[in-house]
Amino acid sequence: MSKGKYVKRTFPLAGLHCAGCAARVEKILNAQTGVVAASVNLAASTAAVEYDTMQTSPERLRQAVQEGGYDMLADSDDDTPDELERMNRERYRDLKRRAFWAVVLAIPVVVIGMFFMDMPYGGAIMALLSAPVVFWLGRGFFVNAWQQLRHRSATMDTLVALSTGIAYLFSLFNLVFPEFWLSRGVDPHVYFEAAAVIIAFILLGRTLEEKAKGDTTASLKKLIGLQPKNAIVVAADGTQTEIPISRIRVGDLLAVRPGEKIAVDGAVCEGDSYVDESMLSGEPLPVHKEPGTKVFAGTINQKGSFHFRAEKVGAATMLAQIIRMVQEAQGSKAPVQKLADKIAGIFVPAIIGIALLSFVLWLVFDPSGGLTHGILAAVTVLVIACPCALGLATPTAVMVGIGKGAEKGILIRDAVSLETAGKIDTVVMDKTGTLTEGKPVVTDIVWANGDDRAKAVFFSLEKLSEHPLADAVVHYFAGVPTLNVERFGSLTGKGIEGTVDGVRYFAGSRRLLDEQGIVVGKELNIEAQRLSAEAKSIVWFADSEQALAVAAIADRIKDSSVEAVRELQAAGIDVYMLTGDSRAVAGHIAEKAGIRHFEAEILPQDKAAFVKRLQTLGHKVAMAGDGINDSAALAQADLSIAMGGGSDIAMDVAQMTIISSDLRKIPEAIQLSKQTVRTIRQNLFWAFIYNLVGIPVAAGALYPVSGFLLNPMIAGAAMALSSVSVVANSLRLKYRR
């Protein structure tokens, strides 16, 4: 049997109206051969499906969904965002139009029912006005209910169709055959206004809900909007042609003019400019780009112009990967949602059972008016029950939370990671590249005689060296003129030498200077000892007679690291630093960063064991790293955080990626997680309370005590409000600090 190829894709869905619909489609997809896992997001109207391409295809999946009474977009990934946007716009416009006319027609029905019931032909006018509301504007409820019935299923639309259909037909019977009741001493009532207003309120509620759901995906739309449509390709003869980005190939030379968006990922070949990367990294300051530096799709060029060579195109660009990550994350389910999903799955059949039970109980205990009261109570129960609030409680909050993270340059892999982040009590971080810049830089330089010529000689010597520390000196002196060095030589383990204008110069260790009999001044010696005590590498520069300068080189702590550590500790989170460096170097870095706990001289394989040791002590551990040597520890941690400048392997393992490598994003992510989980709990609490209180009241539980029987119109308004309030509460997340 051939080995299959597994892919994970997100497909837009049409026809989802409630949590029951989402549960039904999810069940259909998971039942298909070749599907590993499928998850439906009601708030986004999407299905995230992992499947074996050898056993099934998007077209087969779409066919299965269509047979269930729904629809799924199965076109190529490139077309999906635009097509999804078009579908959402059309759905919103259709809902708004139907809601408007339903309200227009329902208002006179309510006015007649409340104030002019005794007017001639009042009942007939109400029947005529409410018929188009129920059976034309509300036809979608009946069509969907019938499709679900054919598949032995029931959803929110089943409840609406049953309640409004029963209310209308019962009223029509009472209007046409009033003597049936009058002969039994019962005054016949009509409930046309209830049927019309229920449809109007639900359509209005769904319109507001659709608008609010659109706001929850605003962050994703913003990311998709970063992708330019066209780019300028430069031919071998220098001619420039504008082409769609879909035609760009790896290796193409592209031109970028001031103010333009960069089309694909690549490396600058010619020219320089500043590029605004804030939409990807969350960093506000433009980044300088010169030959050799990387540029990314979706970022915006400022005032300069440059040419760059395409390295990653289409789905391989960083922006495309971020969009895919955010889509998959927003479509994922938090553990807290599992209970709500189970309840939503059995909700509709249970409500139909409660409605029938309330009808029977009214018939038994109130023989005189029981039929009327029973039908009214059953209709109200069907109307007020709302699985949508339960179904929307978690995904709307997750979508807003993950979208907000993406805007800040924090990529969260899925809802589970988002929920886990709020439980973290310990953060372990690698030193090199995570806490520090990850490359040696000159932190201090002390001169005995620091004229421009001496600087030029030091720079020219180090420029010829292959030692790793030489790059730091060369970078430090960037812009200094290069002098001609003769008789250059490398003294293994000690340093380098060379002659400039007949004078011999040396750069390297103190041992080299001592062997050459070079005099070291007292002040330089004291400075060298001080810098060495700070765990910095020392490079001496001298001529053949005396030491001219001492340079200190170290892997500098990031400006953001100290503040990040302080914020984490202030939040009650322990911070540990791991490094393979000596205890002296580790101790100095930890002290400067304000870290109380550190492990030095630790091997890559020991990092995972250290994380596991903390976990056995009961800690919830987040590991932040940037390299291949961190991948095992990242995989072991409860929450793995990759720093954006690191290796692809670290990012593949990580549940969270900080694009800018700014450690301050870690406390931000933890705070965002806590806010999101708090919002989910609030949503679920109110959704449960609404149904637990509303359904018994609708069934007539208060009638024996107070004579109060809930009007179906009020029930319809309450049901619509419950869904809208859940989405609105989730949207509050966007504006919290």
Q: What residue ranges belong to the model's regions?
A:
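Membrane-embedded alpha-helical bundles of multi-pass transporters
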Residues: 115-118, 150, 169, 404, ...
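Flexible metal-binding regulatory segments at protein termini and peripheral loops
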Residues: 1-121, 222, 239-242, 320, ...
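Conserved ATP-binding TGD loop and adjacent catalytic N/P-domain core of P-type ATPases
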Residues: 500-502, 537, 542-682
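ATP-driven catalytic headpiece of P-type ATPases
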Residues: 97, 299, 425-466, 494-576, ...
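Bilayer-spanning, highly hydrophobic alpha-helical transmembrane segments
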Residues: 99-109, 338-366, 378-386, 391-396, ...
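Conserved cytosolic catalytic headpiece of P-type ATPases
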Residues: 1-5, 41, 287-294, 368, ...
